[in-house]
């Protein structure tokens, strides 16, 4: 008899995929021994003749179901018109600790923008009663201590996910446009008796996009001060995909300009800003602290190595099982595990969400949906200077060999 781990190596699939096959009864003679399974030595890997065509999924999938949110990052729309995987307990985990400034680093297409928009909708005070978008979600079951924060803060929200240009001039113009749009969301400040004429003059500069580069670099700091004065409540600042323009600067030769701007931009917003309730940033990379976060001692970094928030970006095994059940294709679980169950965030095994929703939406045809969803210039540069030892380890990984790395992470 062999273990699931031994069979996984022989069949070249994940241990969880083998376990799932055992649970579903697809491996004749497999028996459970305590918490593990024992598999006959002569067992062969179950074959699904429908894998290549996806015909089973197309015929068997229930059609009277909400569509999956491919490319949808609007929380209100996602949770009302599409199949939504409830990630609202991220709010509880945050409120239990209340770090002043949080940075979440995750791979691209892992739901960062959708989660940040969820935070915006939850916390932002508006004329609309936005509690209706959370009353059937997990966060609402957590009690009044958490509900008391709903709709109680002014919010500044920016996403840099589309700031992808070949020059510094085009980049700064796009950032100026984003600030113009965000200031436009807060035009109530222009009629506020608590805002000085000087501040309103600056506000109109940003609104008309006539401010210079230096003035623009302090726009977050100044807007947070005006919102705090008007509402008697310091705002929450959310910056999504903060590192996108920095990556572009690295690959397009304007790195010094973007780093210099971002250092002042973020320093004014997050460093010793008394007009800040909380701050959230998301990105793919951890840019060196001395580059743009110099002196920002209140920054809490949450990477793929950390247990905190490990289940809120990407799909967990339970969430994938529920999704497959909803669409009536539970038989596809082992195949989906084999293809897309490839991440360990903290202590949580995580599926690539972009691949999962595309796989189900496109008739359960397995393929590399995540390929070519972003740029890899930085990785390419790292590989060019990689040592022979690193190259050897990479070859081992490509051959399915498990390797051990000892490393330290620095900001």
Predicted regions, residues:
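A short, Lys/Arg-enriched interface patch at domain edges and termini
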Residues: 41-60
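Short, well-ordered beta-strand micro-motif
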Residues: 38-40, 159
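Ca2+-coordinating acidic residues in Ca2+-binding motifs
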Residues: 6, 43, 241
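Major-groove DNA-recognition helix of helix-turn-helix-type DNA-binding domains
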Residues: 12-38
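Phosphate-binding site recognition
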Residues: 61-411
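Polyanion-binding surface elements
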Residues: 1-17
């Amino acid at each position: 008899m062999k273990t699931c781990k031994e069979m996984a190596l022989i069949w070249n699939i994940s241990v969880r995929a083998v376990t799932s096959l055992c649970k579903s009864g697809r491996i004749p003679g497999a028996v459970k021994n305590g918490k593990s399974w024992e598999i006959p030595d002569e067992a062969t890997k179950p074959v699904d003749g429908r894998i290549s065509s996806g015909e089973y999924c197309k015929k068997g999938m229930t059609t009277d179901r909400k569509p999956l949110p491919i490319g949808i990052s609007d929380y209100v729309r996602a949770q009302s018109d599409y199949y939504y995987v409830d990630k609202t307990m991220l709010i509880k985990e945050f409120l239990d600790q209340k770090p002043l400034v949080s940075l979440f680093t995750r791979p691209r297409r892992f739901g960062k923008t959708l989660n940040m928009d969820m935070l915006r909708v939850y916390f932002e005070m508006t004329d609309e009663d936005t509690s209706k978008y959370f009353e059937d979600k997990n966060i609402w079951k957590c009690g009044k201590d958490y509900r008391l924060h709903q709709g109680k803060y002014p919010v500044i929200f920016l996403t840099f996910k589309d700031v992808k240009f070949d020059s510094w001039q085009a980049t700064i113009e796009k950032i100026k446009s984003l600030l113009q749009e965000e200031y436009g969301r807060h035009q109530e400040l222009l009629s506020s008796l608590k805002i000085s004429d000087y501040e309103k003059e600056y506000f109109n500069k940003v609104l008309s996009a006539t401010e210079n580069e230096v003035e623009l670099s302090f726009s977050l700091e100044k807007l947070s001060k005006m919102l705090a004065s008007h509402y008697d409540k310091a705002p929450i600042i959310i910056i999504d995909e903060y590192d996108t323009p920095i990556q572009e600067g690295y690959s397009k030769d304007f790195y010094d300009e973007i780093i210099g701007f971002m250092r002042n931009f973020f320093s004014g917003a997050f460093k010793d800003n008394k007009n800040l309730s909380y701050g959230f940033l998301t990105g793919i990379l951890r840019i060196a602290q001395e580059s743009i976060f110099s002196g920002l001692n209140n920054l809490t970094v949450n990477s793929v190595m950390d247990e905190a928030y490990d289940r809120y970006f990407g799909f967990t095994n339970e969430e994938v099982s529920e999704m497959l059940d909803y669409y009536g294709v539970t038989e596809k679980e082992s195949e989906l595990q084999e293809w897309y169950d490839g991440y360990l965030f903290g202590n949580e095994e995580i599926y690539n969400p972009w691949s999962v929703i595309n796989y189900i939406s496109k008739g359960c045809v397995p393929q590399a949906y995540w390929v070519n969803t972003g740029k890899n210039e930085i990785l390419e540069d790292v590989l060019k200077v990689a040592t022979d030892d690193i190259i050897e380890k990479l070859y081992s990984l490509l051959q399915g060999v498990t390797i051990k790395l000892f490393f330290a992470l620095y900001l």
